[in-house]
C-alpha cells in the first residue's frame, strides 16, 4: 500500500484590512453590530442577546455597548484602524454602540444614519395603551 504524503496543517492567514465599516442595527428589542470591510464582507458581528442579555435587558444601552465591544475586539485581528459607522433603527443602543467602538480604539471617520423611512408604505404598529 502506498504511503499518503501527510500535509502539514496550514495556518490560515487573516487578511489585513485598514479601513472598515460598522453597521449598527438598533431595534427596540435588540442591537446588532456587524463590522465589515470596504466591500461589505463581514469580519465580525455581535448582538446584545448573544452577549448574555435576555428579555428586556437586551434593549438597553449597556447591552448595545457590550455587543459593540465584542464585535470591535474580534475585528482587531484583521488590523482595522478606521471605521465608517452606519446606524439603522430607532433603538436605545444607537449612541452607546458608537461610543463603545470609539473606546475600543477605532478612529471613527464618518457616522451615517441609514434608517429606512417609508414614503407612506406599511401601516405602523398601533399605539401602546399601558
From Swiss-Prot:
Gene3D superfamilies referenced in this protein's UniProt entry, alphabetically: Ribosomal protein S11
Matching SUPFAM superfamilies: Translational machinery components
GO cellular component: ribonucleoprotein complex; ribosome
InterPro entries cross-referenced by the UniProt entry: Ribosomal_uS11, Ribosomal_uS11_bac-type, Ribosomal_uS11_CS, Ribosomal_uS11_sf
PANTHER family on file: 40S RIBOSOMAL PROTEIN S14/30S RIBOSOMAL PROTEIN S11 (PTHR11759)
Function: Located on the platform of the 30S subunit, it bridges several disparate RNA helices of the 16S rRNA. Forms part of the Shine-Dalgarno cleft in the 70S ribosome.
Family: Belongs to the universal ribosomal protein uS11 family.
Listed NCBIfam families: PRK05309.1, uS11_bact
Protein name: Small ribosomal subunit protein uS11
Amino acid at each position: 500500500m502506498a504511503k499518503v504524503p501527510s500535509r502539514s496543517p496550514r495556518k490560515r492567514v487573516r487578511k489585513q484590512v485598514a479601513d472598515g465599516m460598522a453597521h449598527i442595527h438598533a431595534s427596540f428589542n435588540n442591537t446588532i453590530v456587524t463590522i465589515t470591510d470596504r466591500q461589505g464582507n463581514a469580519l465580525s458581528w455581535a448582538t446584545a442577546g448573544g452577549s448574555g442579555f435576555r428579555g428586556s435587558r437586551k434593549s438597553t444601552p449597556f447591552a448595545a455597548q457590550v455587543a459593540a465591544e465584542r464585535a470591535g475586539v474580534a475585528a482587531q485581528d484583521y488590523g482595522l484602524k478606521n471605521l465608517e459607522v452606519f446606524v439603522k433603527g430607532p433603538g436605545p443602543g444607537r449612541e452607546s454602540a458608537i461610543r463603545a467602538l470609539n473606546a475600543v480604539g477605532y478612529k471613527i471617520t464618518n457616522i451615517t444614519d441609514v434608517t429606512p423611512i417609508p414614503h407612506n408604505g406599511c401601516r405602523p404598529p398601533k399605539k401602546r395603551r399601558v
